[in-house]
Structure formats: C-alpha cells, structure tokens
Amino acid sequence: MKIGNREFDVKNRTYIMGILNVTPDSFSDGGKWNTMDHALMHAEAMIKDGADILDVGGESTRPGHTPVSAEEEAARVVPVIEALRKRFDVPISVDTYKGSVADAAVQAGADLVNDVWGLKYDAGMADVIAESQTACCLMHNREKAKYVNFLPEVLMDLQESVDIARKAGIAKDKIILDPGVGFGKTYEQNLEAINHVDVLQELGLPILLGTSH
C-alpha cells in the first residue's frame, strides 16, 4: 500500500511506527516532546532507529486522560507536522478521532489518519479521509470491556468500521486495521488480541499493533 510518497510492502515485511506525543499527559512520554525542538529531536532519533512512519498525537487517549478541544489539539499537532514535513522525508500519521483536527493535519502534510474510534466517534471523519485520499488506520475500541464472544465481536466491530470507510469512498488499499490493545479490553483480552492477529487478517487488510510497552 502507498502512504504518502512511499510504498509499503505490507504482505512481506513488518514496519515500525514511531510515536511522537506532543501532549502533557500521555501514558509513557507525556510532557517529554511538547516543545518544537524536543519534538524534532525525538523524531530524528526515531528515524535513525528505524521508524518507517511517524505518528503525531495531540491528545492523550490513556485511561483517565484529560480531553482537549479540537482547536487546542490542532494547535498542538499542526506546527509539528508542518516542521516534520519540511525536515524529514518520512510518512506522517496524525493520531486523532476528530474530523476537524484530521482535516487541519492533512492540510499541514499528514499522510495517514490514525483514528482510535474507527470512524465511529465523528461522523465527518470518513469524509475528511475520503476527500483527501489519505490512508487511514481504523482501531477497535469500546467504552466497556464487555463481550460475549471476544474475537468474533472484535472482527464484527472492525468490519463495521471498514464498511463506514468504504461507504464514504475510502479505497480498500488505503485502510489499515488495529485491534486496539489497551482500549476497551481486559488484560486477558489484550493478550488474546495480540495472540490472534492471524484471525484479524481474515478481513484482508494490513494490521497495525500498538502496545505501550
């Protein structure tokens, strides 16, 4: 699949996404990179360490996080994305579930929208992605970790996200799926999702696996 100007051979190799949180309260690195100099320094270090794509986040999604407005989130990520675009030749992802933030990020140079609610939070998100023709990562998420049949329900939920994307006009070769480790799942369910990535591949799309540690 193509993300930005780079081809990703997702069928034959694994790629690394470097996470750049420009937030004061993210799970692992809150407050470390929320100045421009520190953000660019960390981005350069991740690229040297082998990151194939950089994911910029302006709002923590950890349990108990403090929500921020779309305006504040955009103000955090847009300048960083613009600076990354000028300085590095690497695809850039924006981690947001808000359509207006995604739109601003794409205009600033983002190549991929990473939505932790799989297009189910903001009704306008799918249209933003479709119109910009960027790639997207659709993550599985639920407000509560309540399941009758865990894996089949995860597959069903992800298929719903894919259906929303396709209905909006997002091409299938622009879609990545994420089982959402740490989101709406118990510890045991997180491990089950990780151990059964092969089941998720039944949907015929690339899989992104994001774990905090």
Predicted regions located by residue number:
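Conserved anion-binding
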Residues: 24-26, 61-64, 102, 108, ...
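Glycine-rich, proline-tolerant flexible connector loops at the mouths of alpha/beta enzymes
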Residues: 26-28, 52-79, 181-187
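Alpha-helix-loop-beta-strand connector modules within alpha/beta enzyme cores
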Residues: 66-94, 99, 103, 129-137, ...
